[in-house]
Amino acid sequence: MKKLWGGRFTKTAAQWVDDFGASIHFDQQLVEEDIEGSIAHVTMLGECGILPKEDVETIKKGLTKLLEKAKRGELSFSVTYEDIHLNIEKMLIDEIGPVGGKLHTGRSRNDQVATDMHLYLRKRVIEIIELIRQLQRVLVEKAEQHIETLIPGYTHLQRAQPISFAHHLMAYVWMFERDRERFAESLKRMNKSPLGAGALAGTTFPIDRHLTARLLGFDGIYENSLDAVSDRDFIIEFLSNSSILMMHLSRFCEELILWSSQEFQFIEMDDTFATGSSIMPQKKNPDMAELIRGKTGRVYGHLMALLTVMKGLPLAYNKDMQEDKEGMFDTVQTVIGSLNIFAGMIETMTIRTDVMEKATKQDFSNATELADYLAKKGVPFREAHEIVGKLVLTCIERGVFLADLPLHVYQQASPLFEEDIYEALNPYTAVNRRTSAGGTGFTEVKKAIEKAKQMIEA
């Protein structure tokens, strides 16, 4: 079958060559954006007097009909026409006749596809920003319920200091806030129109790029036609932002996986987000958390792949750039799916507060309180650290915890220890005394929650 661009050629490609070069099996996801961009383009051609008004109206009616069919999932695509752009153009010509061939006046597939991807990604980034906001709401609500629930805080996955469980949850609220900010900031750079840049050098037609930009909701245009069609940094930035977001989700998933194990038993996943074993009847596996953790690697891979594709390309467009889409589409699907699943896991998980709090009393995570106790009485912190370290060793040798040591043992270590040391060792006291800004003290956590509420809804 003759190609729409086939005038210069004397031979047709073999089917297997067409199959290798075609992108329609994945770029059909741009169908709505492609038609929307074409409607704006032909509207501009009419406003600028480049096409007769009657032709413009005929083309717009044909495109509108195709858009309605696309939204209903009624369009069928062919590898013969390679990509979404030529498929739509062929459908338009079939729908309204040869006048449909005028649509591409003053436009190249190079600026067309760049426009499609800007429109597509803008919609998805806005959706992702809202999903992050919704996840933050879930975390803040859960944190409000557990301000005075204690949990061991860890470094090196070793118990370090007791903290408020709400404080732990709020740490992720702030991480996700930075993720949300990154996506929002990327929108400002992304929301520029490449339409009208042509293949690379602009066009001889008296087009109005600012008009099409306004019609499509862009804030402005790419100021350089070569830049407009040559770069995919807006996709790379999206993949980078997605990678950081997925890293945060993956870290939290790792904790949920650990906490739901028999070794921790801090939480239990809702049945909705767990699976069983085909051989072991007792198993309840945190598969959804594991999948998010695993899918993070896919997103990283897409980022590295596109960076690698782009790193050696001379300006302007090269067919290598066709490889920008599948990773983008997959990342969009992965991020949106992960955010929805993760919010559901947090919302429905059972939190075993008794197990968490018991864990804060069966370790040496209150040792820092002893060192601080001595430091506040004038002992150099390094000396206090040494004294408390030896007391911990004494406990280990006796098989007890710090709160179990009699006062005379403390006073043998330092005469500055008094009866009030036992109150300092109480995990609730230890947590609540950490009132420095951003600390785990209950009053500070409450402040953080209120601040986060305002931030999320701003």
From Swiss-Prot:
UniProt cross-references to PROSITE patterns, sorted A to Z: FUMARATE_LYASES
Record keywords, A-Z: Amino-acid biosynthesis, Arginine biosynthesis, Cytoplasm, Lyase
EC class (word): lyase
Listed InterPro entries: Arg_succ_lyase_C, Argininosuccinate_lyase, Fumarase/histidase_N, Fumarate_lyase_CS, Fumarate_lyase_fam, Fumarate_lyase_N, L-Aspartase-like
Pfam families: ASL_C2, Lyase_1
GO cellular component: cytosol
PANTHER family the UniProt entry points to: ARGININOSUCCINATE LYASE (PTHR43814:SF1)
Name recorded for this polypeptide: Argininosuccinate lyase
Organism: Anoxybacillus flavithermus (strain DSM 21510 / WK1)
Taxon lineage: Bacteria, Bacillati, Bacillota, Bacilli, Bacillales
